[in-house]
Curated annotation (Swiss-Prot):
Matching InterPro entries: Aminotransferase_I/II_large, HisP_aminotrans, PyrdxlP-dep_Trfase, PyrdxlP-dep_Trfase_major, PyrdxlP-dep_Trfase_small
Keywords, comma-separated and alphabetical: Amino-acid biosynthesis, Aminotransferase, Chloroplast, Histidine biosynthesis, Plastid, Pyridoxal phosphate, Transferase, Transit peptide
Enzyme Commission number: 2.6.1.9
Expressing tissues: Mainly expressed in green tissues.
rRNA-binding as UniProt keyword: no
NCBIfam families referenced in this protein's UniProt entry, alphabetically: hisC
HAMAP family, alphabetized: HisC_aminotrans_2
Modification sites for N6-(pyridoxal phosphate)lysine: 273
Protein name (Swiss-Prot/TrEMBL): Histidinol-phosphate aminotransferase, chloroplastic
Length: 413
């Protein structure tokens, strides 16, 4: 290598151009002269200091709007001036009964929280295989189903690729697509919230999108994708991600086993609703072997925590509790639906999930209704999207939560 000779930065050094490659005789030293800036050191330093951090951010993220999450108890408590136990939280579709008692016991008896978790979540996947009837080699666990949605996109989508979204639906699909630099083709649902299969087929043929996200039951309306519709979409040359976060409440069998015969199907599940583990973030998915291999390569190695795996395994050991809670929530859903039909300014939609979507009518403002109920300590979901303007969503709670909601609603009629 040559020796670089630097000149004083306040002057300009002029040198002859030298060949980029040459031989150097033994005991000879090559003198390389370079151009130096005539800008004073202090001024150049100030210019460098003016570079802001956002200069390093990927351009497509600079205008990304953050995901709008539901506020947790501690934040709501401060804002409303109420104790957490005095807030009726019907805005996030959480399981009000919480996990089986075995979960709390297992977490208290956890022996090795200081050891990294199993990267393959083998114990959990074995338990899920027994629970679902699908072999563990088709199953991958994640830090909530949300992590798996992002992982799928990172493995499937190049910047500029397209996905199909069918609003109104879970907004995480559109958000993660934006994070990954993909474009979203929206195929709105029919007025009854069913899928527009003909339009989906046209989009797949002409736009060649990589994947489509379907939720069954769909969030926020609680409608389901029947087998005939799903098979029609699976016949298209597109990867179908079926989100079954709420399938337990639908009375339908999960499609997890279908991944063995459909190479273009992924099925996602979660412990948040069924087992009351939303706060511990543990989800899972069923994948064709031709796809799951690459997700294993790309996923974070320690994505499912020791606590999450312990809790999920403990929950699966008490299927009777899980079944009883499901039955209780389905029964309360039907009672809540009938009560909401009696409210003169609400038009509820039948639901296969643990929530009910209502159209706000009779001149009542949906956003103000949500805000007024919040001041009374009852939280429901309101939407800003054009597809759901004038709608609210109510999660199914315990019977006493329903009573509190109905008591507050009576203030308006």
């Amino acid at each position: 290598m040559g020796v670089i000779e630097l000149c004083n930065t306040s002057s300009i050094c002029i040198g002859r151009a030298k060949p980029s490659c040459c031989s150097i005789e033994r005991n000879q030293r090559r003198r390389i002269i370079c151009m130096a800036s005539s800008v004073p050191v202090q001024e150049e330093s100030q210019q460098k200091q003016r570079v802001t951090g956002d200069a390093f951010i990927r351009p497509h993220l600079l205008k990304l709007s953050p995901y709008q999450p539901i506020l947790p108890f501690e934040v709501l408590s401060t804002r409303l001036g109420r104790k957490p136990e005095d807030i009726v939280k019907l805005d996030a579709n959480e399981n009000p009964y919480g996990p089986p008692p075995e979960v709390i016991e297992a977490l208290g008896a956890m022996k090795f929280p200081y050891i990294y978790p199993d990267p393959e979540s083998r114990t959990l996947r074995a338990a899920l295989a027994e629970d679902s009837g699908l072999e563990s080699e088709y199953i991958l666990a994640g830090c909530g189903a949300d992590e798996l949605i992002d992982l799928i996109m990172r493995c499937v989508l190049d910047p500029g690729d397209m996905i199909v979204d069918c609003p109104p639906t879970f907004t995480m699909y559109e958000f993660d697509a934006a994070v990954n630099g993909a474009h979203v083709i929206k195929v709105p649902r029919n007025p009854d919230f069913s899928l527009d299969v003909e339009r989906i087929a046209e989009v797949v043929e002409h736009e060649k999108p990589k994947c489509i996200f379907l939720t069954s039951p769909n969030n926020p309306d609680g409608s389901i994708v029947d087998d005939e519709t799903l098979l029609k979409i699976l016949d298209l040359p597109i990867l179908v991600i079926l989100d079954e976060a709420y399938v337990e409440f639908s009375g339908m069998e999960s499609k997890m086993k279908w991944v063995k015969k459909h190479e273009n199907l992924i099925v996602l599940r979660t412990f948040s609703k069924r087992a009351g583990l939303a706060g511990l973030r543990v989800g899972y998915g069923a994948f064709p072997k031709s796809i799951i291999e690459f997700l294993w390569r790309a996923k974070q190695p320690y994505n499912v925590s020791v606590a999450a795996e312990v809790a999920a395994c403990a929950a699966l050991k008490n299927p009777t509790y899980l079944e009883n809670v499901k039955v209780a929530l389905v029964q309360e859903r039907e009672r809540l639906f009938n009560l909401l039909k009696e409210v003169p300014f609400l038009d509820p939609y039948p639901s296969y999930s643990n929530f009910i979507l209502c159209k706000v009518t009779s001149g009542m403002d949906a956003k103000k209704l949500k805000e007024d109920l919040a001041t009374m300590g009852v939280m429901i979901r309101h939407y800003n999207s054009k597809e759901l303007k004038g709608y609210v969503r109510v999660s199914v709670g315990k019977p006493e939560h329903t009573e509190a909601l109905m008591k507050c609603l009576k203030h308006f009629y």
